[in-house]
Regions:
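Solvent-exposed loop and edge beta-strand segments that line ligand/cofactor-binding
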Residues: 1, 7, 11-15, 30, ...
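Structural helix-adjacent loops and short alpha-helical linkers that scaffold large soluble proteins
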Residues: 2-20, 27, 66-82
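CBM-like carbohydrate-recognition segments
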Residues: 48-55, 60-122
């Protein structure tokens, strides 16, 4: 989220407004069952799309921190908690050596075929 945004920051209101717009979209595209978010938000469970860890982690963090800091309406807390619980339930794995891994992390993203990406889903 907006981190530690000083009260006297000249663009504070603008940044908080943007965060609220983003939060609305994040809430809209949260997967109802898992609480996570898909790699391509607006494509849902379409073939080839998947519930992705890094965006889900950042979204849950932004919502919860935004509420805690007072940048977001408290209604977003429920969405953030659902995302956090989804991460714990679906994406965290304990390895044989006792370490913890976050699974389903996207290393590279892009749309289109090889060798050039044209922005299409295929």
């Amino acid at each position: 989220a907006a981190g530690n945004l000083p009260e006297d920051h000249p663009r504070r209101a603008e940044i908080v407004t943007i965060l609220n717009k983003v939060a609305k979209g994040i809430k809209k595209y949260q997967d109802k069952k898992s609480g996570l978010w898909y790699q391509l938000l607006d494509q849902g469970s379409r073939k080839g799309n998947y519930l992705e860890a890094t965006a889900s982690s950042m979204f849950a963090n932004a919502l919860l921190k935004g509420v805690r800091k007072g940048y977001l309406h408290p209604k977003y807390r429920k969405t953030g908690i659902k995302g956090y619980r989804g991460i714990l339930k679906n994406l965290i794995r304990e390895e044989n050596d006792g370490t913890i891994s976050l699974t389903r992390c996207c290393a590279v993203a892009g749309l289109g075929g090889n060798p050039y990406r044209d922005g299409s889903y295929e």
